[in-house]
Structures are given as structure tokens and as C-alpha cells.
Amino acid sequence: MVFFRVTNSINIKITDGTILKYDRFKAPVGLENETIYITTYDDFKDLQDIFSKVDKNRYLAKILNEKSVKTNPNFPTEIGISFENEYKIKEEFKDNIFFDIKPSSLLYSLNSFHKPIVKVALIGSLGSTISDMISSMAALRIFYEELKNIYSKVELDIFIKASNNSYYKRDKSIYETQKYINGVYPLAINSKTICKYDYFVDNSVDISKMLDINIVDAWLYKFGIDYKKIPSSKKYSELNCEHFELSKGLSQKIIDAKKRGKLLLFHPYSATINKSIPQNFAIEILKGLIDKLDDYVIITTLLIDPKIKSDNYIDLSTYSKTIEDFIYIVSSMDKIITAYTSALHIADAFMIPTLCIATFKDYEESLKYYNYTKTIYVKDSSKNLSKFIYENDSLTINKFEEWKKLKIEDIIKTLEIF
């Protein structure tokens, strides 16, 4: 986490319309103070960029000594692995490998056993992508349940990056699918507010990017929980969509589609190009599914090929406008075929049989707790003849050789195993 003050008062409007107020610093540091702010490293850097664009001489965010702020006797107790002096380490070394990861114990971190009710603040998101956040929900739920074994009531709030986060509304919606989360708020948090909590967890450093283990296990380790002692059967995510406000017409579109047959979502593209199904092959797979699966209605939320028209094919790309729309669509499916995308993680939360076409070697570790997923691995057999560090597609050979071996019959056969 980063502790800082601002040189002049300023208001910032974030993407959902919320106004964040930053007031000019007033001493002292060691007491509850509405002008001392705490946020994640990434959010702090975004804030610095905003200040620089407004007036780089008038508006500055200046680092404070975190130990001085934490001397306040009312400052909450930290749970889990600590990353002190994060700003200094990242500015000097530019790499997370220089952090000293010291194992922590959740039980030994606690000190308010006499209280029936405790408040916990999580500072920062559990990852930045939809896939990371939804996967990590399993660890967050287990963390909450472990606390509930000790306290009669646990109020869990999460504060997420907001200063220049175009996905703030999306990220907030994802966390609001968790019934055990009390509230989702934008960063930064001031020291007066954080002192109302009993405990805090510093998620500014993404622990899952530092440990070569499954993302659920990584976050359990971060929370001070021995992931090896948690049964695999408990490492699942849940998504509550009862409160969703869907785009107009989407619900009826799904109802009408279900009357025509079983629904199969085909979702070939990831935000990471190397995890996506190449476009030409995605189009051919889509055509094959439409042609060979008469008892299914094929659904997409991506405009794969506007020229494809069929009675058993529905393109919902104009209806899938928000993360809530997309989660609802995925939750309505009977089966799913996808690349390694957020659809995979959402589907497992709803126990929907899913075929993942994976393109990276460590997919087994990533999917080890997904009981409703089958996988076809497409190996990257490409070779780059360029002698330079940068990639040159014109000098890459065999790039699609393994994709050419992937047959629609093999995809359908694997799908029918469920």
C-alpha cells in the first residue's frame, strides 16, 4: 500500500459518476486524519498522472512514512502477508521479485477475539482481469468463512482502484456478486476511515503473479491460510446474479432461444491474443457447430462473422453490453466451448459443462479445481526465424500447424463426454 498526502484540495470524478475528494494535508500524521490517504501502488500512479495533467505544479501527491501513520493505536491490524515499503521497493527495483514474502498465519494475526463483530477492509482487488477476480473469489469466500468460524459477524469491505480505472464499474459489479461482501468502495481510503476497521488486508501487490501455484492457492497463502489443508471441494467460486439489471430485451431473447433447443455458447476470443482461437479457425469451428449440432442453438456474444446466418445460431453481441449481461448469458447456457477466457471461470461458478480450447502449457494448474471443464490443448509449434528480440510475423513459420490438426469432430466428441 502507499500512504500519501496532497498539496492542494481537488475533486476527481470517476467512471460511475462518484466524486472522490482529496483535501489538502493537515497535521498530525499519527492520529485519525481525513487528509492522509492510503491506496494501492497502481492507483497512486494513476492519481499522479491525473494531478500532472490538471496542474503539475499545484497538485502533487507526496509519500508519507507508513510507519508514522501506523503508530496510531487505533490503526487496524494487518492480516496475511505484509508488503511494507511497497512504493520504495517498486520505484527502486521495478520488480516484485525484490519483495520478501514471509509466511503468515491467519489465526496468529487476529487479536480481537473478545469482539462478536469485526470489520475487515481489503485494500485493492484480487487481480485486475475478470478471470483473475472470479477465480480468486473462491479464496476470498474461504477467508470469510475462516473468520466466521471465530466471530459471530464479519463485515467485509473491499476498496478497489478507481482514480483512472475505466473498468471500475465492471470490477465493482463483479464483487457485488458475492453475498458475504458488505460493501465495494473506490480507493483511496483516508486514515480516519481505515481506523474504523479491526483488520485490513493489503492486496496492492498481486500475490498470484509472484507464486507459481494455482491462483486460489496463491490468495489463500496471502491471507495466511494453509492452502494444502483446504479440501479441493471447497475451492470453488459462486456468483449471485439475482440483483442484476440486464440490458433491455436480453432476458426475453434467452427465453425464446431456450424454446428452440439446448443452448451452446461459443466464445473463441480472449483479451490476450495468444490465448484466443485464431479468427479463421474460430469461424470454421462456428460453421461446423452450426452444421453438426442440430439439437443445439449456438450462441455467441462476439461478432465472429457477420456473414453467418442460420436458424440455430444467435449472435447476442448487441445485447452483451455489461459484465452483468455477460454473466447472465453464460449462466443460461447448457454447455460452453471457449478459449481460456472469463467465460470459463463464470461457467464453473454455475457448474456448466465447459470445453476449454487451451493454448498455454500450464493450463492444468490453472484449471485443477474446475470439475465441470474438459480441455483440448493446442500446442504452439511456431518457430521464429528472426535473429532479433522483437517478433516478426513474416519470419514465423508453422504458426497454425497445430490448429490445422484440430477437427470439429474431436471438439464435438469431447463436448459429448459430459
Q: Where is each model-derived feature located?
A:
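Catalytic machinery of carbohydrate-active enzymes
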Residues: V2-F418
